[in-house]
Amino acid sequence: MITRMSELFLRTLRDDPADAEVASHKLLIRAGYIRPVAPGLYSWLPLGLRVLRNIERVIRDEMNAIGGQEILFPALLPRAPYETTNRWTQYGDSVFRLKDRRGNDYLLGPTHEELFTLTVKGEYSSYKDFPLTLYQIQTKYRDEARPRAGILRAREFVMKDSYSFDIDAAGLKAAYHAHREAYQRIFDRLQVRYVIVSAVSGAMGGSASEEFLAESPSGEDAFVRCLESGYAANVEAVVTARPDTLPIDGLPEAVVHDTGDTPTIASLVAWANEADLGRTVTAADTLKNVLIKVRQPGGDTELLAIGVPGDREVDDKRLGAALEPADYALLDDDDFAKHPFLVKGYIGPKALRENNVRYLVDPRIVDGTSWITGADQPGRHVVGLVAGRDFTADGTIEAAEVREGDPSPDGAGPLVMARGIEIGHIFQLGSKYTDAFTADVLGEDGKPVRLTMGSYGIGVSRLVAVVAEQHHDELGLRWPSTVAPFDVHLVIANKDAQARAGATALAADLDRLGVEVLLDDRQASPGVKFKDAELLGMPWIVVVGRGWADGVVELRDRFSGQTRELVAGASLATDIAAAVTG
């Protein structure tokens, strides 16, 4: 196929968009692959759509290879199935809801577990029909509070979501591993650098869960890994290494001190080191109690106290994952006014217990550990408050931040921090959705068997940005051959009529060899054409320029930057095709 740039719907930009934060956002707009419509909404222009379709093709190849069958559901979905699973409420403000002219409720689908489950239930009734894997590549919608980074976090996006249905746990495990391996092949073919990390299931439900994260310093997802063992996990899924309990006998009694104006950890530590407590005090010796209000879907709001060592901050993502599917918010001044026993900056376990406030603490706060914490009165703290003797929490919670150097949960060494972009997520859902819809089939013994499910997603449109994020330089995009809009960008950098005719003939020869060609036949200067060729990022650039008169053309490798001259003879197209496919 030959596409002439003189006919292509394309306009490149020389300057970065003012609101673009990351490289992929800047380059995809500058190169004319996408255009913004509204916050979180983008149009796909011809070049961008070709990249998107190439990625879809790779995904279809690998999904079909593991026995997946493609279907397509509507994006506009009725309320009833989501009420059955309680996700109509759980999703809160993150979905787009609307009513038809008769007042019936609908949403724009964020995911389709309910529809897949109901469809399989309606079509199949025997164990003989399984195992089964269905998938779709479809536009999804989420009302992101802060869409950012172009198509990396948009309100409308393309996803591949697949679902496996099996009659037992062994079948689910096999389907899960088949998808895991298929995802590795997909991302390898797309030349994406990625890591597989343990993850939490969130609103999806289920048990085993892993994320595929594309390594990127601009990624929203923090993850950790242990270089000694290969352990890797999203920060939400990291389990804190719980220390051993300590003996309580012989520890000094807790003492309340007047600490003055010390509402912060820093001011409390400063006081402690001036108070001659007989030791040097650090923030790690203090117990910070954070109050939040929690609301379960469709339920009432309750107070919850989170206790963490004073040298740690509460991580919003870890806290949110631990409380899923509940919503939460920090207490404001009005909340403190309603609960006068909560003295801001001086909250301790005593008032929490006396007022029946649920209290969850970091796993490091084990019996026998001694703490400096609030005494529930302005300007007063208690020193030497011992867990298991002076206070007992209602449980533990993984809410404190994870840090570089923390011990790996497997005990093999320290954790190293990194950032990534989520490109895939696989879950062993189990029977969460088949329970909700009583999706049973007759087993081999004639008795009902409850189906078990797996859920597997890939961010298709996000992958366009991820590949651009990982494959670019200061000149522009550098698409891997698997996803590039065209195999070769053929630049006519010579106004001579014979050179133009030769370039056009070369394009036709390449086309006959199955090479897709973008032919820059515009009446523009060579400098403009070269800049556009580098910006657009085809893996190979062929230049028909001044050397044509001497029987020579240039072949440039966009990745390595290397240029070599080829003889413009009978084998020219074959030589270029060999380089492109080799």
UniProtKB/Swiss-Prot annotation:
Q: Which residues form a coiled coil?
A: none
The record's disulfide annotation reads none
The answer to whether the entry has keyword Thylakoid is no
Q: Which GO terms describe its cellular component?
A: cytosol; peptidoglycan-based cell wall; plasma membrane
GO BP term (any one): prolyl-tRNA aminoacylation
- Show the cross-link location (Isoglutamyl lysine isopeptide (Lys-Gln) (interchain with Q-Cter in protein Pup)): 173
Instruction: Give the catalytic activity.
Output: tRNA(Pro) + L-proline + ATP = L-prolyl-tRNA(Pro) + AMP + diphosphate
Quote the EC number. Answer: 6.1.1.15
Q: Which InterPro entries match?
A: aa-tRNA-synt_IIb, aa-tRNA-synth_II, aa-tRNA-synth_II/BPL/LPL, Anticodon-bd, Anticodon-bd_dom_sf, Pro-tRNA-ligase_IIa, Pro-tRNA-synth_IIa_bac-type, Pro-tRNA-Synthase_IIa_type1
What subcellular compartments does it reside in?
A: Cytoplasm
Q: Return one GO MF term.
A: ATP binding
S-adenosyl-L-methionine as a keyword?
A: no
The family database entries (CDD domains) matched by this protein are listed as: ProRS_anticodon_short (cd00861), ProRS_core_prok (cd00779)
Indicate the principal place this protein occupies in or around the cell: cytoplasm
Q: Which UniProt keywords apply?
A: Aminoacyl-tRNA synthetase, ATP-binding, Cytoplasm, Isopeptide bond, Ligase, Nucleotide-binding, Protein biosynthesis, Ubl conjugation
Among HAMAP family, the record links this protein to: Pro_tRNA_synth_type1
Subunit description = Homodimer.
What does this gene product do? Catalyzes the attachment of proline to tRNA(Pro) in a two-step reaction: proline is first activated by ATP to form Pro-AMP and then transferred to the acceptor end of tRNA(Pro). As ProRS can inadvertently accommodate and process non-cognate amino acids such as alanine and cysteine, to avoid such errors it has two additional distinct editing activities against alanine. One activity is designated as 'pretransfer' editing and involves the tRNA(Pro)-independent hydrolysis of activated Ala-AMP.
Q: What is known of its domains?
A: Consists of three domains: the N-terminal catalytic domain, the editing domain and the C-terminal anticodon-binding domain.
Which protein family is named in the record? Belongs to the class-II aminoacyl-tRNA synthetase family. ProS type 1 subfamily.
- This one is known as Proline--tRNA ligase
